[in-house]
A protein has these predicted regions:
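Pocket-edge structural micro-motifs
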Residues: 21-22, 81, 113, 262, ...
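Residue-level signal for well-ordered, solvent-exposed loop/turn and beta-edge residues enriched
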Residues: 86, 128, 257, 286-288, ...
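A surface-exposed beta-alpha-beta supersecondary segment
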Residues: 103, 139-155, 261, 276-279, ...
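Beta-propeller blade signature
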Residues: 72-84, 169-179, 272-285, 331-340
Length: 364
């Protein structure tokens, strides 16, 4: 988003996108999951059968590296359109090479220039920029953080939140105020008795109605800014789950309700066994199983990201979950009606263990 003439806006019709970037010091790009055990439980979901169009074997990806030359950098950036299932003809986002950046579930990119430290929110579709304070310290130059927005950045109530994915600390600022970043350290024991569970699940925050939510399995944590950060912990009912497998959960908002998607696998075996969806029944504060998404589609990066879109608007298959797995270049599509999962190879030239980011188009 450096405003250069050779970097054109991306065509909205090619979104959503997979963004592969070999040399970028990407936030959370397969940072090790130290102190973050999987939940030793499994959702009661339909078995997923697999059809593969590539010979992709999931592996733990290596941490990506900083770019060493402009020529090498240009070859390291690869876009893949999820709705057309092919590489788009247009070239864009080359200016990512000179920035640290974080992809938000709202489609905006939090960006920070390597040299000038200029910091802003960038719209990859329109090239619009919204300036942010540069901040103190190195928290905007680390790959162990992620970013979310409470509202659209043009909303005066918008809070830009940066979460540390290895410690109980967060940073936040307001684009409207624009004065400075604030640091807040919170005590994990106030949210859960397990420090590692808190750190691991807080990185999977989602936004709903201007409030941030985290799923700690037996509780839902609500984080509000009024104007200072305030946590509220609410117990929720859960079904008893088998103990023979490990499950990752991703929280997301869809049509004004909270959902969580579960990905279950046999412990110590990198083979996906189950995909399930639950909705939070607010009246009874309990998770209930969902059998259909209707005309919606969920996009999930199982490491920390979830979003819901209209299938018709996005040009995707309705009642499906499009998801990425840790350390795996593959794009997986789970069909809720059939209970089957299809694996798509976005590029045979891509290394198998280079995971992508999901890039959405910001709402108008």
């Amino acid at each position: 988003m450096n405003g250069s003439q050779d970097t054109a806006p991306l065509d909205p019709d090619i979104f959503p996108l997979l963004l592969f970037h070999y040399n970028n010091y990407m936030p959370m790009e397969e940072s090790s999951d130290v102190d973050e055990p999987d939940h030793d439980n499994e959702q009661d979901a339909d078995d997923a059968s697999y059809k593969s169009d590539g010979d992709d074997e999931p592996e733990e990806a290596e941490k990506s590296h900083r770019v060493e030359s402009a020529e090498e950098a240009n070859d390291s950036l690869f876009l893949y359109s999820i709705n057309t299932m092919q590489e788009p003809q247009c070239r864009g986002l080359d200016d990512l090479e000179s920035h640290f950046y974080w992809v938000t579930p709202q489609g905006w990119l939090l960006m920070r220039h390597h040299d000038s430290r200029e910091t802003f929110l960038g719209n990859p579709s329109t090239r619009e920029r919204i300036s942010l304070p540069s901040g103190q310290g190195d928290f905007l130059e680390e790959n162990t953080t992620r970013c979310l927005l409470s509202h659209a950045p043009t909303d005066p109530n918008c809070v830009v939140l940066v979460i540390n994915c290895r410690d109980t600390v967060l940073w936040y600022c307001s684009p409207a105020a624009g004065a400075q970043w604030f640091e807040h350290r919170y005590e994990s024991w106030r949210l859960d008795e397990s420090h590692s569970v808190v750190v691991g699940d807080m990185r999977r925050l989602t936004t709903f109605g201007g409030v941030f939510y985290a799923d700690l399995f037996h509780t839902v944590v609500k984080l509000q800014f009024s104007p200072h950060p305030t946590f509220t912990v609410t117990p929720v009912g859960v079904r008893s789950l088998p103990l023979h497998s490990c499950t990752d959960f991703q929280l997301l908002e869809s049509c004004g309700e909270l959902f969580r998607v579960s990905f279950g696998q046999q412990c110590f075996v990198d083979e996906l066994l189950h995909v399930g969806v639950e909705r939070l029944d607010v009246a009874h504060m309990a998770w209930v199983k969902v059998h259909t998404l209707g005309d919606r589609v969920f996009l999930v990066n199982s490491r920390y990201f979830g979003a819901s879109l209209s299938a018709q608007v996005a040009g995707l298959k309705p009642n499906c979950i499009y998801f990425l797995r840790r350390g795996d270049k593959g794009l997986y599509i789970y069909n809720m009606e059939r209970g089957t999962t299809t694996l798509h190879n976005p590029g045979r030239h891509l290394q198998d263990d280079v995971a992508a980011e999901i890039l959405l188009i910001p709402a108008a």
